[in-house]
Each structure stands twice: as C-alpha cells, then as structure tokens.
Design a protein with these regions (language model features):
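Histidine/acidic-residue-rich, glycine-tolerant segments that coordinate divalent metal ions
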Residues: 1-128
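Active-site-adjacent C-terminal substructures of enzyme catalytic domains
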Residues: 101-172
Length: 172
C-alpha cells in the first residue's frame, strides 16, 4: 500500500508545478471494497476499511481526497463512515451489501453511490439492495455510467424517473 501513499503524495507534487492544472479533488475508489464485487480492481490491493490508512492517504494528498468508496458490508465500514462522514463524501460501491446494510450505512452518513448498478447486486423484488436503499434516502446522490454500454438506455431513463435529475451524477 506504500504505492497508494506515493500516488496520493504525487498530487501535491504535481500541483506545485505551475504549468500543471489545479487539482480540485481526488476520488478514492478503492481499496475498501468487497472482493466479491471488485470489478477491475486488483484483489491483492483490496482491504477492509482502515481509518489510520485513510488518514495516511489523506495526509499524503494534502487533504485532496474528497470522495472515498466503501463497501458497507465489510468489517470496519460502519466505524469508518462515522469517523469520516463530515470530512469527505462517503460513497457506497463495489459491494454485496443488502438493503438493510446499505440503509444503515446511509443513516450513518454515506450519502453517495459509486456507479449505480455496476459492481453491486441487482435491484430485486425480494432483495432490493443498494439501489432501493439509495432511492429511499432523499440525501443520496448516485453516479451512473451513461455510455449506453454499462447500463441499458431504458434503465438510465427509469433511473432518472426514480431519482430525479438533481440526484444523479453522470460519469465516464
């Protein structure tokens, strides 16, 4: 994980070069993920939510981490969310969390979802999961990869109906 610390430290170095763009924030999507929902992430780097390690990353970045993805079904996630909810956006993602687990994480302060529908259980009529928990939380913002490949266009349209445009962040 020393490599991750070095990567975050490089954000500070890059910003000191006046010829480079200003970094307004960093999105830390990993390593606090559910290995069963890792997607393209390398499993050997995945770890449980770790308060001290995140502090090291945040310090190395000069406080530039603005969003961190956490799988709420992982051991230590609840304490992690409670610790950092006022400092960064806690985003739920790469998770096998069920509805109750996701809803509890949202009650604790995680009010964002990383790429809705991808790397999580689908919305089911008996197992509604993260998707329904996010829809039920009026404070929750959701990201969608709107490229027509990751999510079917009909699902994109229905998600706008379910959440409203003010709660959706389109990402690539």
């Amino acid at each position: 994980m020393d490599a991750l610390i070095r990567i975050f430290a490089s954000a500070t170095e890059v910003e000191q070069d006046e010829s480079c763009a200003r970094i307004v924030g960093l999105n830390m999507e990993g390593p606090f993920l559910d290995p069963a929902k890792k997607g393209a992430h390398v499993e050997e780097y995945i770890r449980k939510p770790d308060i001290e390690f995140f502090r090291e990353c945040q310090n190395a970045s000069g406080g530039r981490i603005k969003v961190v993805t956490v799988a709420p079904n992982m051991e230590g996630a609840e304490e992690f969310i409670e610790t950092f909810k006022d400092d960064v956006v806690i985003s739920i993602g790469h998770t096998g969390a069920d509805y109750d687990c996701a809803a509890k994480a949202m009650e604790k302060g995680a009010h964002h979802v990383t790429h809705l529908y991808n790397a999580m259980n689908p919305l089911g009529h008996r197992a509604p999961g993260v998707i329904a928990a996010a829809a039920d939380d009026p404070l929750c913002m959701v990201e969608m990869i709107g490229d027509g490949i990751h999510i079917h266009p009909a699902v994109v349209r229905n998600t706008f109906r379910m959440f409203g445009e003010e709660r959706i962040v389109l990402i690539s």
